[in-house]
Amino acid sequence: MKFSKNMPADGKYLLYLLTDITLRFMKLIISSSELLKGVMAVAKAIPAKSALPILENFLFDLKGNMLEITASDSELTLRTQIEVESTAEEGRIAVPAKHMMDLLKELPDQPLTISTTSDSSFMCSWASGESTLPYFPAEDYPEITGTDETAVTLEFPAQSLVDGIASTIYATADDEIRPAMNGILFDIDVASTTLVASDSHKLICYTTADVKAQEKASFILHKKPAGILKAIIGKDAETVEIAFDSKNASFKFGSTLVICRLVIGKYPKYRDVIPQNNSNILRINRTQLLNTVRRVSVCSNKASNHIKFDLKSGSLTISAQDLGFSIAAHETMPCQYDGEDLTIGFKSPFIIEILSNMNCGELVMKFLDSKRAALILPAEEEAESEKICGIIMPIMIS
């Protein structure tokens, strides 16, 4: 038994020791497949390497017939609960994540008995075998800090949140100087909520009228937890309960809880850059435009990825060339175009990203001239309560 400097010095000392010992021991029976689902649900938070080696473990907390599993990298925490078949002894231990996952992946679905055998090891027993693994004291696991009493709370339809993240996350930046650009802005208003992402070359807004607040609020969610949320919110989830303060945010759905630190910083005034008076309007089939851009961009310069749009009444010609390799391509498409003849250049990967992440049949592109941002949005609203728009900066062309 290790002695701690923080041990009580009065008559409660014996109780402290007994409690410390009890919490380190546990025994339960659980479905191996259900346990695998549980650990995989939180495994994305396990760091590959950490300054705190304890974070390379799952924290198991057994209370009654519920096993709570926690994984964290100190910035992001995932927690879920699963029901066990029987509990012989409650407790809390930290178990090695990789070894636990590797073992469970190789087991067919069957009852699995987990029991501590000493103050540093536990046994996983199944019908035809067993495995002994080390564990670590739960008190070594860092305390997880959630939101405080100032937190703003709201409910977000699960599918709308997934769609909003999927529609914007690809436009986030990797900017060490402006960390706010590395996340998605949740701009919450009394009439709607808008998710915004930008890397300065393109800006994407996803607005839903299903989420409102009594007063305006906002937070910036880093792309990593945003991507994990998109991946782990299942189709059976109906609502995500969100709480956020000035430092942290939590997302609760079903038996899963996600806690993460927010990006600290001020997001640019994105509404100021959304074009309002672009009068040259192109209406075209999204899939056909996407496929044409992909074909033509094969012959673009691989360093610049420049492609050119030549817009005239009734037609759009897309062209690209790489003088260094003496290759070029162009393709003309029928379209509906109302406006002045216009030639404008773009980086093909940005166009491809935006078009690939819109689900509409037809889209509208609005231009002012060859030097200012173009606006891209669905020609028809896919749902009355949701809308998406993209803004892309042009490039100078010769």
What do these predicted regions represent?
Residues K2-S398:
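Structural preference for solvent-exposed beta-strand-turn elements
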